[in-house]
């Protein structure tokens, strides 16, 4: 049964109740002997009231009037359930939007598509309320985003300070563990220094008063180091 038939049936039942004969209750009399109304007077009052009710029902609750009221009620129900065309909106707007996401809140439509039957004053009030709440939510989410970024930066700083947690004695050990490229570079440097020291033990250092002597010493060390490297390979 649709809304029209349901409401029409309800009103017809109420009208039939109005047409039922009215009678006073059996215990309407008070236990007082003086000032009592006679039963005939009470029955006459009820009869006249019944006639007035029936006349009122006939004038105001006719079959055509009942149909008209039921149709108006159905129209109101349809208007309450119908809103403006929002097919252009994202499906998230059908009760699934994540209000904790900054991008989702920014994508909310402005102005919001309110119901068609809303009066202009109501729409303005609702729009003002919507704008205020949206602004507050955007402010909170922006602050939250900034705090999360700050936390990420602090976590990076904390990770960089991990080698210093156990004091100076463990700094070098932690740096060696955290940076394998540094280990490889230092090993190569130590090997090169050892080779140079080994070569320098057999080289006599002449006076370094002129540039030619400095150049000849440098060439000799480079030549011996190069030959030593080839022989080792």
From Swiss-Prot:
Membrane-spanning parts: none
Example of a GO cellular component annotation carried by this entry: Mis6-Sim4 complex
Coiled coil: none
Source domain of life: Eukaryota
Phosphothreonine modification, residue list: 189, 191
GO biological process terms on file: cell division; mitotic sister chromatid segregation
Similarity remark: Belongs to the NKP1 family.
Function recorded in the entry: Component of the kinetochore, a multiprotein complex that assembles on centromeric DNA and attaches chromosomes to spindle microtubules, mediating chromosome segregation and sister chromatid segregation during meiosis and mitosis. Component of the inner kinetochore constitutive centromere-associated network (CCAN), which serves as a structural platform for outer kinetochore assembly. Fta2, fta3 and fta4 associate with the central core (cnt) and inner repeat (inr) region of the centromere.
Summary of subunit composition and partner proteins: Component of the inner kinetochore constitutive centromere-associated network (CCAN) (also known as central kinetochore Sim4 complex in fission yeast), which is composed of at least cnl2, cnp3, cnp20, fta1, fta2, fta3, fta4, fta6, fta7, mal2, mhf1, mhf2, mis6, mis15, mis17, sim4 and wip1.
Protein name per its UniProtKB record: Inner kinetochore subunit fta4
Gene designation per UniProt: fta4
